Amino acid sequence: MTSEAIEVLIVGGGQAGIAMSEHLTERGIRHVVLERERVAERWRSERWDSLVANGPAWHDRFPGMEIPGVAPDAFASKEQVADYLAAYADRIGAPIRTGVEVNSVRKREGANGFHVETNAGAYDARYVVAATGPFQLPSIPPIIPEAAGVTQLHSSAYRNPSQLPEGNVLVVGAGSSGVQIADELQRSGRQVYLAVGPHDRPPRSYRGRDFCWWLGVLGLWELNAPPAGAEHVTIAVSGAHGGRTVDFRELAAGGITLVGRANAYENGKVRFGADLAKNVEEGDANLFALLDAADAYVERNGIDLPEEPEARRLLPAPASMTNPLAELDLAEAGVSSIVWATGFRADYGWLQVDALDEHGRPRHQRGVSTEPGVYFLGLPWQSRRGSSFIWGVWHDAKYIADQISIQRGYLVNEPAPDSQPYASLRAGAARPSAVDADAVPGSAAPAPVTAQTTGTHA
């Protein structure tokens, strides 16, 4: 069976794959993007109906294009985000092939590059970029067995309250997804129990500026690693209902029963950790720390922004905090459904090269894999705190494109047998004038590494 030769093969047609395509196109590097479903599929079919972006439209976008029909300070719906990504891909002419699932990537025997098997044929690629991100498989802790007699689903499968059977609901996980789903269910008339773990809860806005702006001017988007001990702390922020600060005391005052982390299950009862008050109070402390930093920045720079003392006011601790539930009998409480907002795990089973650790996680430095020729894109904290955002992945993609350009420069004078698909990489091969995913890869001297432009958060 013949294989199609391509210089760079990108796996994944979401925001990371699109950003990667843009920067490779600018450098004249031939490539193809393989997407197993539609462009931005996860935004379209694996999120709840009312989801909006967690950041304002001026922030959660690519640098070169605004989100059509969305005011800069508004929060785009999931449909608007998906349509935006597809429109951006069209604008840059990204060579995306949809409906193509990558089954395996292996090193080529006796030759440079990688052999890629898909459901629509095979490829031989000089470089491979894994742009699928880490959110591939829903992660549900093995706590409550299926025999418990309640409906259990992951947040990626939740759509709206009417999807769930009649009865009360336990939501496990108090990050952005868990908080918004719990709030939606409570507003629909359900009695909701919300299991709260460690979290950060930044202000939605403070002194007239969104928290995304504050993280930018304070340099916090550029942190290259989470603070020690906070590696698994989730962030609770919401753009729902026009955007508001997540306040667990306020959620409790509205009728949601807060509980600690779900730890175990036995005889129809879910047991919770004795950590609820600690988790809520540490989230409050995180909020106040950012407010303090913002106030200091305003004073230090003489900026005229209105003071906002009400941002520091807390409601009294609810009864669920002062006298927390140690366990919940699901039947007695009328709980018929459990929504697990407990995140995802990566799935790189198709990447069959020496690029993963013993836990299946990428081994890399700023996306450059320990396997020469393989790159990762779209990882949280790939280079900085902002790497998970659209603008952040765009800058990470620029860096990866620069690295590929440098590596191509080393190969310009590489002797390559004419029988290999990379014969045109020899010295003197013409620089491609346009992206052509169907052509045998050409060659180019490495593109100059330009200074990184300012992110949209600054």
PLM regions and their residue ranges:
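A short acidic, helix-capping loop that chelates divalent metal ions and anchors anionic groups
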Residues: 68-72
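Flavin (primarily FAD) cofactor-binding/catalytic cores of flavoenzymes
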Residues: 2-45, 75-432, 436, 446-458
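Long, low-complexity intrinsically disordered regions
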Residues: 442-443
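A short small-residue
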Residues: 62-66, 378-380
